Each structure stands twice: as C-alpha cells, then as structure tokens.
C-alpha cells in the first residue's frame, strides 16, 4: 500500500515568519562522525551535523513545493558534537523576501546536545522557484 503524503503545498504568501517546526532529535554515533570525516577527506573534521541537512529536514516534513535552489548558507559552529550524545535541532522560518520578482525563504536551525551545549546554527536562504534559474541567460 502506498504511503499518503500529507505535507502541505507551500503557499509563500501565507507562510509566516517565525513559524517553528517540530523538534528533530537524533543520536550522533561514532559511525556518523567517521562517515562524515571520510566524505570530506579530513580525519579530524569536527562538525558532521552539517552533513545531515537537519536545518531544512523539518521544513521538508511539513511542506511540499516545486523544489529550491540554495542561494546562500551560513554555518556557525560553536562546540564540536560528541559521539553518543543526543542532539536536538530546533528550526523555524526566519525570514521570507521577494527579490527581483522571485520568492525566497530563510530557514534557521540550532542544534544543542543533551547537556544543553550549543553545537551549531545554520541559516539557509532558498530560492523557491527553481525554474527561474538560468532565465537571465536565456535558459
């Protein structure tokens, strides 16, 4: 039996800045850290949390849309996460704006560990009309 997709179709006009998503929790394992380090070819890489796209995971669980193009992303890393600790990610709509007739949303996500240590903050600007990419060059 097919799974029902109960996500909401994104209505950019109705989207509210400040909307907070359900918290996402996961256990960061040593295997996750090792896989990340292998992927970035750095045996001492400290922030595997950025590899999981936890900043937009909860948005994607709530909304469906035509896709997006990352316009800008900022990662602020504070304390390296520790294997075996449970991480909680809180994400929200931080902003939305119209630029050159195109709709953008800004999601912000903060990760903390089970001890309350701030791990990272990720701010992502997304163009919510991916079909617009390349039009200025005749694409």
Regions found by a protein language model. Give the residues of each.
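Well-ordered beta-strand positions in beta-sheet-rich domains
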Residues: 25, 74, 121-125
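Short glycine/proline-centered loop/turn elements that form peptide/ligand docking sites
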Residues: 55-57, 72-80, 87
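Short structured motifs
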Residues: 8, 71-78, 92-93
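HotDog/MaoC-like acyl-thioester-processing domains
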Residues: 2-4, 81-139
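Hot-dog-fold acyl-thioester-processing enzymes
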Residues: 1-72, 133-139
């Amino acid at each position: 039996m097919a799974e029902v997709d109960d996500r909401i179709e994104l209505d950019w006009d109705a989207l509210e800045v400040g909307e907070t998503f359900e918290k996402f929790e996961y256990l960061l394992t040593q295997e996750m850290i090792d896989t990340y380090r292998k992927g970035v070819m750095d045996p001492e890489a400290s922030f595997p949390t950025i590899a999981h796209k936890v900043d937009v995971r909860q948005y994607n669980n709530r909304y469906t849309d035509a896709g997006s193009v990352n316009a800008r992303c900022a990662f602020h890393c504070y304390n390296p996460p520790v294997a075996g600790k449970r991480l909680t990610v809180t994400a929200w709509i931080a902003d939305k704006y119209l630029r050159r007739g195109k709709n953008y949303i800004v999601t912000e996500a903060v990760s903390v560990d089970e001890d309350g240590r701030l791990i990272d903050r990720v701010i992502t600007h997304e163009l919510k009309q991916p079909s617009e990419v390349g039009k200025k060059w005749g694409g």
